[in-house]
């Protein structure tokens, strides 16, 4: 038989546990505290609410209308997007654009080279430099849309418009060609007139030169004849004296007159 344990030990064992080190843990105290909190929880909540209501009423009576929002926490307001949207044909678009790493590096390198402080200025510069490419793209898009239209009537209208445009362009080109031809003809006519006048002036100059040359030759020939006649008179014997000399002088004078008459006739024929 086991030895009987005293009642004091039994009651003690019911309310305590002995651990390995000999210390006693009071289970009754732990459980009693738990039961107290659970049993008195509704009472505590009601008293807390009553106290809050009393404080609120007291503040209203005293003239302090405080906001009871601290007692009831509210949700924080969601931050609105301060960037406005842009409405396009594809719908609203955000003004902010996300770039890849490589494109972002190139973009900011270009911005540093240009010396701009805002990315929008860099984009504006790029758009202005690519105006011709944008125009070509718009024209290609418009031609594609016109060519891909399913309506036959629309195609006929487009073809008629293109024919009218081609005819109009041909008419303009013909007018321009006619104007160019008229200008060329007038220029050529003026050039022909100037050349004809130049040739006439050249002929006149040559005639004058020929006349002067012939006169000079005639003068030289006459001087030579005078010299020859003077030497002949020195060798002639004065057989008849004065009559012979007068005959020689009259003969020379008659020859010179006939020579000058012939030369004048030639000059008149040339002129």
UniProtKB/Swiss-Prot annotation:
Localisation per UniProt entry: Nucleus
Pfam families: TCP
Disordered as annotated region, ranges: 64-85
Coiled-coil blocks: none
Main localization (coarse): nucleus
All copies of domain R, residue ranges: 192-209
Keywords, sorted A to Z: Developmental protein, DNA-binding, Nucleus, Transcription, Transcription regulation
Gene Ontology terms, MF aspect: DNA-binding transcription factor activity; sequence-specific DNA binding
GO annotation terms (biological process): regulation of secondary shoot formation
GO cellular component: nucleus
TCP domain span: 79-137
InterPro entries to which the protein is assigned, alphabetical: CYC/TB1_R_domain, TF_TCP_subgr, Transcription_factor_TCP
Function recorded in the entry: Involved in the dorsovental asymmetry of flowers. Retards growth rate and reduces organ number in the dorsal region of flowers.
Protein name listed in UniProt: Transcription factor CYCLOIDEA
Lineage of producing organism: Eukaryota, Viridiplantae, Streptophyta, Embryophyta, Tracheophyta
């Amino acid at each position: 038989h086991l030895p009987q344990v005293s009642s004091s030990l039994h009651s003690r064992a019911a309310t305590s546990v002995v651990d390995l080190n000999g210390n006693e843990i009071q289970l009754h105290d732990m459980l009693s505290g738990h039961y107290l909190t659970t049993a008195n929880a509704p009472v505590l909540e009601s008293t807390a609410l009553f106290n809050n209501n009393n404080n609120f009423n007291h503040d209203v009576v005293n003239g302090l209308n405080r906001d009871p929002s601290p007692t009831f926490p509210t949700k924080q307001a969601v931050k609105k997007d301060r960037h406005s949207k842009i409405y396009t044909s594809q719908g609203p678009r955000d003004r902010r654009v996300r770039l890849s790493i490589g494109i972002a590096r190139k973009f900011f390198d270009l911005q540093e080279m240009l010396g701009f402080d805002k990315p929008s200025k860099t984009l504006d510069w790029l758009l202005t430099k690519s105006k011709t490419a944008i125009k070509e793209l718009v024209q290609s898009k418009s031609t594609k849309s016109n060519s891909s239209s399913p309506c036959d009537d629309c195609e006929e209208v487009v073809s008629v418009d293109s024919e009218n445009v081609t005819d109009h362009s041909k008419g303009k080109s013909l007018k321009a060609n006619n104007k160019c031809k008229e200008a060329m003809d007038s220029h050529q006519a003026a050039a022909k007139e100037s050349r004809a006048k130049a040739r006439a002036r050249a002929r006149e100059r040559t005639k004058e030169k020929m006349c002067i040359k012939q006169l000079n030759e005639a003068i030289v020939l006459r001087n030579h004849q005078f010299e020859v006649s003077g030497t002949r008179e020195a060798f002639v014997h004065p057989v008849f004296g004065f009559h012979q000399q007068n005959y020689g002088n009259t003969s020379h004078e008659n020859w010179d007159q006939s020579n000058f008459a012939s030369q004048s006739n030639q000059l008149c024929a040339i002129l």
